[in-house]
Regions:
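Short, hydrophobic/aliphatic alpha-helical segments
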Residues: 4-22
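Polytopic transmembrane helical bundles with strong interfacial aromatic enrichment
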Residues: 4-7, 122, 169-170
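Conserved phosphate/anionic-ligand binding catalytic regions in large, soluble enzymes, centered on
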Residues: 18-39, 145-163
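Phosphate-handling active-site elements
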Residues: 39-59
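A structural-propensity feature for long, helix-poor, extended segments
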Residues: 52-88, 190
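Amphipathic alpha-helical coiled-coil segments
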Residues: 67-74, 120, 127, 187-194, ...
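Amphipathic alpha-helical interface segments
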Residues: 81, 85-155
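Preference for long, well-ordered alpha-helical segments
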Residues: 130, 145-204, 211
Length: 211
């Protein structure tokens, strides 16, 4: 399979809009999240090693390093999401002419559905951490870069919530109630807290730019 993360922007968009099974919502979520973290990196690169921003020099360097790791992890999840989804797509094509075939398909489906959830789950965890970095940047970034911080937060919220929707669509077909409870218990608090924090960042910056 192609390394989707190395496609041009044009190819990614065209393939997403085609009948191809991937990239889909999960891959798009990972890409949007990666772009959001990249904006944090840009802000930090514009401010490090400059005397006027020396007060937060070490903070900017740390945020730059951390956001770069998150950015690369999200990029890798574009491919992982595609690789995990393709077996599930094949499950839908399995025969169901006999009771044995129905049982075999159902067993395969349950396994593949859980596998398909793993990449969006990681997207949620990573974007949650990235949003917290954006909040720190909001309090320290120069005024001329504050809109980029806000754009990053908005992108990350979109990725966070998109990851959750990709999980929910698969959870609806999973029969393991304990698994469902575990996934929701682990990830829903991150989605809610991360979304609220991203909204706070946006509203604060929007107010600041309108004043």
């Amino acid at each position: 399979m192609d390394n989707i993360s190395q496609w041009s922007c044009e190819k990614f968009v065209n393939e997403t809009s085609s009948k191809a099974p991937v990239p889909g919502g999960g891959g798009v979520a990972a890409l949007v999240g990666s772009v959001g973290t990249a904006l944090a990196g840009m802000v930090c690169n514009l401010t490090t090693n400059k005397n006027e921003y020396k007060e937060y020099e070490e903070d900017f360097k740390r945020i730059l390093s951390d956001s770069k790791v998150l950015q690369e992890n999200l990029l890798s999840l574009i491919n992982r999401d595609a690789e995990n989804f393709l077996p599930l797509a094949q499950c839908y094509k399995m025969k169901t002419d006999t009771a044995e075939e129905i049982a075999k398909k159902e067993e395969a489906m349950q396994t593949c559905l859980k596998t398909a959830i793993s990449a969006p789950a990681e997207i949620i965890k990573i974007t949650y951490e990235a949003i917290k970095l954006q909040e720190e940047l909001r309090t320290k970034a120069p005024a001329l870069t504050i809109s980029d911080v806000g754009c990053g937060a908005v992108c990350l919220k979109a990725a966070l919530q998109s990851g959750w929707l990709n999980i929910l669509i698969n959870l609806k077909l999973i029969k393991d109630e304990e698994y469902i409870k575990s996934i929701k218990g682990e990830l829903l608090p991150l989605v809610e807290e991360g979304s609220n924090l991203a909204d706070k960042i946006y509203e604060n910056i929007n107010s600041q730019l309108n004043s």
